[in-house]
């Protein structure tokens, strides 16, 4: 009897050890990346992609070709060239048996009239003017419920003021609507690089990239008559027939100095971030000019992408995992896909953004659902732009394994905090511990500088938590909620029930445009227990080593690189969005100079990189110095003298 009891206890202890001690699963355990073979000589710099009703996949390339793929989800898709000779296609749609694409200067219908598998009619639906500047990309179309097409136009940049977005021709910096008969309707302006358009439940959304006047990437609800923030397109607000825009460029410049200054020799001076200055935010602009549209969701630059791209809704009814109805957003620079949960509060969209799946071979520009109901085609390119990954272009497919990841399924705003919904039940002990939660809020400057540091940062104390009986929801009381601010919600201490997994992605970024009305929780109905997580010994050792003046190792500096989003754009010895750290080390900057360049980057120092680094004065000086010392330790050692 004693042996049997001992054996049972031993088995139980082993089971608990395995459950509590095993490594938590990661992204690739739930979503697999499949790379189909591509025929030799076929260059897929994917600019547009759409799945046809019969299951074929149409793929448009930036080099002007359109390929039709039979059996695209199979082991050997068959490629057939459908069209060629087009001008940098950056979007593709299907309507009534024809393909519709956005070239640089026109919306084009491609028709295969004789059904031989090749387009024999290239019909111009609508054309718009160009200045021939390289940055005048045109994106779209997305098909509206009435059958018309939405297209968006990039700004150009100045010849001397190469950092400043310009609208040299009408519709640059605009979103516009085109009827099937070719009638154009100006829709909205204030966009800078609107690469991703998405029709969500019949409403138009778009995403933009960090740059001048755009503090960080984000997703905007593109209402008719809205001004999104970049003033270049306002040049045509009163000149375009049918323009719904009321705000003027002069009004913007009277409110925020465009800083078009010159030195004593008459040369234009590039605006740089000014620390400790008085500044306005986009929310301040909205108070003065109500037509200003705030992002429904900010996508923090360097954390949730650097070059936001395709927006696509999950309409698979659960065949792609537990996120039906949510949005997936591609990122060209970081070669990954993010996930977004949207809700409507007091008439405005807002919501939470999460990481989802990284590790694609090149920049994720376009996405399309496969007809198999449970996988997502990923179209990739990085020529001229740079990206993470080992390839310059390609086509891949993201496939759900059928296993449910432990994730925050949704985050909803509450009158006194947030409600977090999970995909699997939480371990209630960890979920009822306030130390499992950490929340801070911040926003961005609205200014003519390229990007913005995070500003007005503040901690938001978690005062209580109420976990639902089924363990699928945790409602948290949060102090210091701020409307229009981004709220970073970190749940590092939470674990799943049973297997005790960590969240695959423990951080959500909720854009709180409106605090909802409603009943608040009472402190008597929530847990207020807080058991702090002890500091790891290794962290103490790292700090001690750094304090002695020794150069930190990569393992010691890696947490700082991750915390400050450095790894989003840089690798140790490989070019990504930015230069490799080994290349920076070859410049032989002093540690102090590197810190200065972190706070105020000089893009002209790296002319071969398309995406300038944003100012990062929020990096603590002691951490910046440690990072600088480590970078300089990578410099090639001089050969010993004979």
What are these regions (language model features)?
Residues 367, 395, 564-573, 627-631:
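The canonical Cys-X-X-Cys-His
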Residues 401-428, 435:
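Surface beta-strand/loop "capping" patches
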């Amino acid at each position: 009897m004693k042996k049997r009891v001992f054996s049972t206890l031993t088995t139980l202890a082993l089971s608990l050890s395995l459950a509590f001690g095993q490594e938590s699963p990661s992204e690739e355990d739930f979503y697999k990346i499949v790379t189909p073979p591509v025929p030799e000589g076929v260059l897929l710099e994917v600019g547009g992609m759409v799945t046809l009703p019969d299951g074929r996949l149409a793929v448009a390339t930036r080099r002007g070709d359109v390929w039709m793929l039979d059996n695209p989800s199979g082991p050997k898709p068959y490629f057939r060239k459908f069209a060629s000779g087009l001008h940098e296609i950056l979007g593709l749609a299907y309507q009534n048996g024809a393909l519709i694409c956005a070239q640089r200067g026109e919306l084009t219908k491609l028709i295969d009239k004789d059904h031989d598998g090749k387009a024999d009619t290239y019909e111009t639906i609508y054309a718009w003017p160009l200045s021939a500047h390289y940055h005048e990309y045109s994106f779209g179309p997305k098909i509206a419920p009435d059958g018309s097409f939405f297209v968006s136009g990039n700004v150009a940049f100045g010849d001397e003021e190469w950092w400043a977005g310009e609208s040299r021709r009408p519709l640059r910096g605009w979103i516009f609507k085109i009827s099937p008969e070719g009638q154009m309707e100006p829709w909205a302006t204030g966009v800078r690089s609107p690469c991703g358009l998405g029709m969500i439940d019949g409403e138009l959304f778009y995403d933009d990239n960090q740059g001048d006047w755009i503090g960080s990437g984000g997703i905007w609800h593109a209402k008719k008559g809205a001004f999104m923030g970049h003033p270049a397109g306002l040049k045509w607000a009163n000149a375009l027939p049918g323009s719904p825009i009321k705000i003027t460029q002069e009004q913007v410049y009277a409110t925020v100095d465009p800083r078009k200054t010159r030195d004593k020799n008459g040369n234009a001076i590039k605006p740089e971030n000014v620390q400790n200055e008085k500044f306005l935010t986009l929310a301040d602009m909205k108070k003065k000019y109500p037509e200003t549209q705030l992002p429904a969701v900010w996508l923090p630059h360097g954390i949730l992408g650097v070059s936001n791209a395709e927006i696509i809704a999950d309409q698979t009814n659960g065949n792609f995992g537990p996120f039906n109805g949510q949005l997936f957003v591609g990122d060209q620079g970081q070669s990954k896909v993010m996930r977004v949960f949207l809700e409507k509060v007091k008439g405005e969209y807002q919501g939470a953004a999460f990481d989802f799946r990284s590790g694609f071979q090149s920049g994720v520009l376009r996405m399309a659902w496969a007809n198999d109901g449970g996988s997502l085609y990923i179209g990739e390119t990085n020529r001229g732009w740079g990206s993470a990954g080992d390839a310059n272009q390609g086509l891949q497919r993201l496939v759900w394994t059928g296993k449910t990841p432990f994730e925050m399924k949704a985050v909803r705003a509450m009158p006194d905090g947030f409600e977090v919904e999970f995909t699997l039940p939480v371990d209630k002990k960890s979920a009822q511990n306030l130390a499992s939660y950490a929340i801070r809020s911040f926003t961005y400057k609205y200014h003519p500088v390229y990007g913005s540091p995070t500003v007005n940062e503040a901690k938001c104390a978690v005062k209580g938590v109420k976990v639902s009986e089924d363990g699928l929801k945790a409602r948290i009381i949060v102090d210091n909620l701020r409307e229009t601010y981004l709220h970073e919600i970190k749940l590092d201490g939470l674990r799943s029930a049973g297997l005790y997994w960590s969240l695959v992605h423990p951080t959500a970024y909720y854009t709180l445009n409106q605090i909802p009305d409603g009943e608040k929780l009472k402190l008597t109905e929530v847990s207020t227990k807080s058991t702090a997580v002890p500091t790891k010994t290794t962290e103490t050792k790292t700090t001690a080593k750094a304090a002695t003046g020794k150069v930190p190792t990569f393992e010691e500096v890696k947490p700082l690189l991750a915390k400050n989003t450095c790894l989003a754009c840089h690798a140790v010895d490989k070019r990504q969005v930015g230069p490799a750290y080994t290349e920076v080390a070859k410049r032989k900057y002093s540690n102090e100079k590197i810190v200065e360049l972190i706070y105020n980057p000089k893009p002209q120092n790296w002319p071969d990189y398309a995406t300038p680094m944003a100012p990062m004065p929020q990096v603590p000086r002691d951490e910046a110095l440690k990072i600088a010392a480590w970078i300089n330790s990578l410099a090639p050692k001089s050969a010993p003298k004979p």
